Amino acid sequence: MAKRKTLPKDFEQLVQTASDEDIKKVLGKCDINAYGGYNKGNALEFPLSEEMMRWLIEQGIDINYVDQYGYTPLLYHAGRMSSEKQAIALVKLGADITATQGLDRETVMHVAVKTGNLELVKCLIQAGADAEVTSRSGETPLERTFHWARTFDLIKLAPVAEYLIGIGVPVTDKIRTYMRSAAEDIEFRRKDMSPDIMPELDRAMESLYGLLGVASVPRRVEYDGTSPIVIHEKRWQKQHGELWNLLVPGSGHAGTVQGEVIRISGKLAYEILDNGCCNWDSDFKSMANALYRYICMGTPLDADEQREFAGLINGIKNADETDINRLTELSVKWVTLNLNPMAVGELDYKR
């Protein structure tokens, strides 16, 4: 009787409740590399015991079987904190520690560092993995991880970074730049974060500041919503950044018209220039129309600039970089003419 090429649909639930002997009986009815689950990986991609994995390897299972998304069992488990034991077992059992996945060809070490699997990282080093191996984009595991690190990622990254740097992995300018960017984002959004997690996050950040030689990002000065707006920068590009940090909240709408002018001009620029309008909808159009209404309030731009602004808003979806820069410049100029805060009324947009 031919053996089935797919694992039972309830195999994942089975391995969490059944004994190894019962699992062997089920697998005995399947091809040794029968696949299943969302990724269509073989049995080694499931949370089996080390003894069960060893038995499967003795039966001839492919320890480096590639699932439909390009993951080997080791790569799959390396990307999950809950699967650290399985990943370590696979390394000990001879899985390919140089396997790569994804368009950027991230190695097992890249995945383990990014996931914060410290014990797996140590195991990989002991097995001879290169801690400075580069992805297709030319980034080492630490560089790649800091590149994409945000908020709570720093908590799990701190001990991994300390270990790798302790064994000689260099701290590059890329790492310092990425850390600075992540820290700035945290400080910008600090007010909106859960206070329960902040002590642990702050400890991780202080550790990384010292470890990487990065100057601490100062706490954000919150605008009170009533005082006259003070601008220190001279060029409009710098002024926009200064006003963004002062007036725009970490999430949601600004509390002043001036803040909404800066926020909307920035969101429009990002959606058009960075996203290619892929998220464009009626709400973006409503925001653009609101932006024009706002700059007609208080002390307006001169007549020629207002007409120019109206033209930019009318053709906003097809705007190029020059158009967006001009829209942003005029938005900043309007704020400089209206330094006394105006409260935002009812909004007809949600973004």
Where is each model-derived feature located?
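Ankyrin repeat domain, specifically the short helix-to-loop turn at the C-terminus of the second helix
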Residues: K24-D31, R54-I63, I88-I97, K122-D130, ...
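N-terminal segments that cap or nucleate solenoid repeat domains
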Residues: A2-P47, E51-L56, I61
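A mid-sequence interfacial segment
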Residues: A87-A89, G94, A99-V111
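Ankyrin repeat (ANK) tandem arrays and their immediately adjacent linkers/low-complexity segments
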Residues: G102-T107, V133-R351
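Internal alpha-helical scaffold/solenoid segments in large eukaryotic proteins
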Residues: L103-E139
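Coil-to-helix interface segments in alpha-helical RNA-associated scaffolds
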Residues: S49, S82-K85, E119, F152-A158
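Ankyrin-repeat boundary/"N-cap" motif
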Residues: R4-E12, A34-F46, V66-G79, T100-V108, ...
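Ankyrin-repeat intra-repeat helix-capping/turn positions
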Residues: A18, L48-E51, M81-S82, G116, ...
